[in-house]
Amino acid sequence: MNDSFMKEKPVLPLILSMALPMVVSMLVNSLYNIVDSFFVAQISEQAMTALSLVYPVQNLINAVAIGFGVGINAVIAYHLGARQQENASVAATHGTALSALHGLVLTAVCIPLMPWFLGMFTDDRTVIELGSQYAGIAFSFSVVIMVSLSFEKIYQAVGRMKETMLALLSGCITNIVLDPMLIFGIGPFPQMGIRGAALATGIGQVVTLVIYLVIYRTVKLPLRLGRSYLRPNPRLDKKLYAIGIPATLNLALPSLLISALNAMLAAFSQAYVVILGIYYKLQTFLYLPASGIIQGMRPLIGYNFGAGEHRRVRSIYDVTLGLCAVIMAAGTAICFVFAGPLMAMFTDNPETISLGETALRIISLGFIPSAVSVASSGALEGLGKGTQSFVISLFRYALVILPVAFVLSRIFGAVGVWHAFWITELVTAAVSLIVYRKSVRQ
């Protein structure tokens, strides 16, 4: 790691140099869900409904992977900033081993529970069967996902963003190529339907992990993974989980939110469940540029905090917030202008498209204020203040939106649920500023 690069380069160019490879890779990586949804929608609306209902559990698995990865990233960046290379290597090794363990547990738990979980939201046996088929294959790759994410966060912590971009792009391109072949049986491949979508995604994730391993063997890094670093270290493991657990909960809360909103919307029509599922696919794509900025910002804040550069930490936060606000403004404009075509990518049902246009335009009103909570939460994670970051997410994904959505849905119907989104973002933005400013003064 270049010390002058992290501590002396002007903040805006520094953030962009760290974040742009992540923005590109995450935008392309978001195509995993977009491409799956696009091709699955061509099977049937029942298949699309199944994919929408599986999404919260899929998001939960990703939340564990990314959330614990945030802990790995923050601890490594801090120790490198403090010039403690051996501690950084221990954190990387323990983080990777624990990530693999998390993957094994999630595979064993999630696959058997899927038929029961899907039955909570629909009594359509075809939807339950399709969802179970997809989950059974997709969730079998949980260990691969966990280990890949640990390597991703390790590379980000040491400033190797281009290597991360290469690995993610390789996996995503593999998924895009294989999806139609495995779903529809093109060329030598059998027609697998929704199972083909899951298998294509899994193979893409394996390709990403293989690229990470090859890079690790060929590129010199300021830390190493090894058996000698696996010796028990409860203090360091506690640090990993102290940041990783709140970060995981931050990312898992949307899964609980989606399930709760699905239950509210299903009372009106299954079309609204499909619309919510489509929105979250699109939201992933629209929010990912901001997420890429946050990914680039976290190690910078952690490194400079570890080096005692507190004024530079404040500057990094301010620039990140401004960049996120610009991205969110662009997302709002896209949803207002192209709401119809965006919905039509995933369904040809005129009623669903019409209802979805209204939903997208209403929900997108909250994009710009959401920049405050996104930037504040990411900065707090980079500073190692995972609990404070979780407080922001708790407001955003549970304490405000659920009661507001429940009340408004009783008054205005399903449209009330859409209005709950922007109301929540305004309230959470105010809470985020208070929590962040109070935390950095401590």
Annotate the PLM regions.
Residues M1-A19, I76-V143, F189-I245, I301-G366, ...:
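Short alpha-helical transmembrane segments in multi-pass integral membrane proteins
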Residues M6-F38, Q42-I43, N59-G71, V75, ...:
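N-terminal transmembrane alpha-helices
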Residues S17-D36, I137, G171, G204-T208, ...:
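Transmembrane helical elements of multi-pass membrane transporters/channels
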Residues M26-S30, A63, G103, T107, ...:
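Residue-level hotspots within the lipid-embedded alpha helices of multi-pass solute transporters
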Residues L27, L31-T49, L118-R125, M181-M192, ...:
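Helix-terminus/linker motif at the lipid-water interface of multi-pass membrane proteins
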Residues M48-A108, P112, I145-G159, E163-T164, ...:
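Small-residue-rich hydrophobic transmembrane alpha-helices
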Residues L60-A63, T107, N175-P180, L209-L213, ...:
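Hydrophobic transmembrane alpha-helices of multi-pass small-molecule transporters
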Residues G69, N73, A138-Q156, T164-C172, ...:
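Short runs within selected transmembrane alpha-helices of multi-pass transporters and secretion channels
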